[in-house]
Amino acid sequence: MIRTMLQGKLHRVKVTQADLHYEGSCAIDQDFLDAAGILENEAIDIWNVTNGKRFSTYAIAAERGSRIISVNGAAAHCAAVGDIVIIASFVTMSDEEARRWQPNVAYFEGDNEMKRTAKAIPVQVA
């Protein structure tokens, strides 16, 4: 059996740019890509916490340390500057690998300040 698992997640980053006329993609600070283990040109899903829209694109690197999250091309219709989004990538693996897998998660606050990283999603409690 093959499973699709969360590979990396940028939790609650703020969109800093939305450029309808740029050639597609989402530009992400290279430090953020590294923290989540997301590669340039990798497929990503973006879930807009602010407006509820969900869309797919691919990651490109923005300048390291810039804190840039730039939603580009047609996807710019799905996010505005200031929106809070979650960016995720996924990986496929065997059932055996999946049972040992730990994702790369980075948590953000304020103006894209990375507060911490983790290798698991916390258990939700009642």
UniProtKB/Swiss-Prot annotation:
Taxonomy, top ranks, is: Bacteria, Pseudomonadati, Pseudomonadota, Gammaproteobacteria, Enterobacterales
The chain's coiled-coil residues are none
Gene3D superfamilies membership = 2.40.40.20
Q: How is the cofactor bound?
A: Binds 1 pyruvoyl group covalently per subunit.
Keywords per UniProt: Autocatalytic cleavage, Cytoplasm, Decarboxylase, Lyase, Pantothenate biosynthesis, Pyruvate, Schiff base, Zymogen
An example of a Gene Ontology BP annotation on this entry? pantothenate biosynthetic process
PTM summary: Is synthesized initially as an inactive proenzyme, which is activated by self-cleavage at a specific serine bond to produce a beta-subunit with a hydroxyl group at its C-terminus and an alpha-subunit with a pyruvoyl group at its N-terminus.
Q: Does the keyword Cytoplasm apply?
A: yes
- List the active site: S25, Y58
Q: What is this protein called?
A: Aspartate 1-decarboxylase
Q: Which InterPro entries match?
A: Asp_de-COase-like_dom_sf, Asp_decarbox
Q: Name one GO cellular component term.
A: cytosol
Its recorded reaction(s) are: L-aspartate + H(+) = beta-alanine + CO2
Kindly list the cofactors needed. Answer: pyruvate
Q: Where does this protein reside within or beyond the cell? A: Cytoplasm
Protein source organism? Citrobacter koseri (strain ATCC BAA-895 / CDC 4225-83 / SGSC4696)
Summary of the function given for this chain in its UniProt record: Catalyzes the pyruvoyl-dependent decarboxylation of aspartate to produce beta-alanine.
Give the enzyme's EC designation: 4.1.1.11
What family classification does the UniProt entry report for this protein? Belongs to the PanD family.
Positions of modified residues (Pyruvic acid (Ser)): S25
- Would you say which domain of life the source belongs to? Bacteria
